[in-house]
Amino acid sequence: MEDKLKGLYAALLVPFDEHGQVKEEGLKQIAKNAIETEKLDGLYVNGSSGENFLISKEQKKQIFRVVKETVGDDVNLIAQIGSLDLNEAIELGKYATELGYDALSAVTPFYYPFSFEEIKQYYFDIIEATQNNMIIYAIPDLTGVNISIEQFGELFNHEKVVGVKYTAPNFFLLERIRKAFPNKLILSGFDEMLVQATISGVDGAIGSTYNVNGRRARQIFDLAREGKIAEAYQIQHDTNDIIETVLSMGIYPTLKEILKSRGIDGGLPKRPFRPFDESHRDALDTLIKKYDL
């Protein structure tokens, strides 16, 4: 299973209308774009880039369903089902598993200061209820939850905890995880550090900017794995120029505007996120043209 899940994934964007409802046709277009145009291996569905923590349980199910119906069985699909409500996480996990998602992923429980034993049991309860494989979603900058190498060991002792989506800048810990658990899947979550992560031995990556810049990510990943580090860095420099500009304009509305430039209905971000600021339009047009986005 771990080998099947290796590769590059779009952290899938989700288009909303002005009332905060999912635009299904736009979602289908975004999913197809990631696979057919950006040439990615799979989709990570209902993660941070899908504005997951701003939407209802029924919307999450709707997104899981539409994406699966759109791409079928030929694309790797990972369902992010993490929720502070364990019952909801289990319900979503069962639903995604029934749809045929290849693995589940769940962000570490956050906001409340949960103990590691509580966090570990949360994952094991989801696995027990769904009988699907689990990829830990470690994003300490947003959750405040730091998992130590010893704690990763306790999680990885469960045969169905197959890996981690590692969205953290601690490359010492990443190296330690890679050395200690050579058979576990590690997917990098920082688009701007793909060269460094690949050198550190990750099996793939999941990125929000891969929705529009996946082809460069593929070049970086392949070159770094071939040991062509200087060449990989040159493309990473361009990628980071793109990322820096996109972040300055607001990541989700800006990525959706880039999709719109391709004739894709990128929709709006979910409130309270603001829509794209039109004062950035000329700069965005320049970015799209310069980097052929």
Swiss-Prot record:
Keywords: Carbohydrate metabolism, Cytoplasm, Lyase, Schiff base
Keyword rRNA-binding: no
Binding site for aceneuramate: S48, S49, T167, G189, D191, E192, S208
InterPro entries, A to Z: Aldolase_TIM (IPR013785), DapA-like (IPR002220), NanA (IPR005264), Schiff_base-form_aldolases_AS (IPR020625)
Predominant localisation class: cytoplasm
Record bears the keyword S-adenosyl-L-methionine: no
Binding partners and assembly: Homotetramer.
Subcellular location: Cytoplasm
SMART domains membership: DHDPS
Gene Ontology MF: a single term: N-acetylneuraminate lyase activity
Catalytic activity: aceneuramate = aldehydo-N-acetyl-D-mannosamine + pyruvate
Domain of life: Bacteria
Function field: Catalyzes the reversible aldol cleavage of N-acetylneuraminic acid (sialic acid; Neu5Ac) to form pyruvate and N-acetylmannosamine (ManNAc) via a Schiff base intermediate.
Pathway: Amino-sugar metabolism; N-acetylneuraminate degradation; D-fructose 6-phosphate from N-acetylneuraminate: step 1/5
Assigned protein family: Belongs to the DapA family. NanA subfamily.
UniProt EC number: 4.1.3.3
Positions of the catalytic residues: Y137 (proton donor), K165 (schiff-base intermediate with substrate)
Annotated GO CC locations: cytosol
Any single GO BP term: N-acetylneuraminate catabolic process
Identification of the protein by name: N-acetylneuraminate lyase
Enzyme class of the recorded protein, top EC level: lyase
NCBIfam families, alphabetized: PRK04147.1
